[in-house]
Amino acid sequence: AGVHASMMVAHFDWPADHEGEGCEEMPLDCTQLTYKLNRLLPPDVAVQAVRPVGPEMHARFSATRRTYHYYIHTRKDPFLRGYSWQVNVPLDFALMNEAAQVLLEYSDFTSFSKTGTDVKTNICQLTEARWEQLKPGEWRFTVSANRFLRNMVRAIVGTLVEVGRHRMTISQMRHAIEAKDRQRAGESVPGHALYLTNIEY
């Protein structure tokens, strides 16, 4: 989908030594490993650091909070191509911010989940959802939660854009969320303007 990440965490199991004493007995040179991984990876992927953690650590399931940013620009700028979504119609960002706050009142985001996904629950605890203007014609949406569903942020932004275009009222957005029906929410926006920016453990 062309989604970016300025912060992404992965984990791996470091092999035990020959005596089976565990990875703590086998020295791990994090600096050297970072260097060697970056030599192998393509130019658009970089390892910032390698850190030892306990055996219970899981990059996905141990996370307690994640933050995404979505960028929109409303005037043509070739330098933003591939990194921000150009919207060529007027948007009411004040109304979109009002709608974003409504999201914090809900926890079941079935209406924003890609259909057919194999997840046990569509419950997510949102703690932040807001638009801010970075400079004239450039806006950023920030959303944080303990977990996200597949395609959830892009569907949320698409719905907020519908509100910003005055094609959906906040009341209609509420009904769409409460219907728990993907068809009732807005279309998913392009992935190239979406960034995973922070993960907390």
Please provide the spans of the model-predicted regions.
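Structured-RNA-binding interfaces characteristic of tRNA pseudouridine synthases
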Residues: 1-201
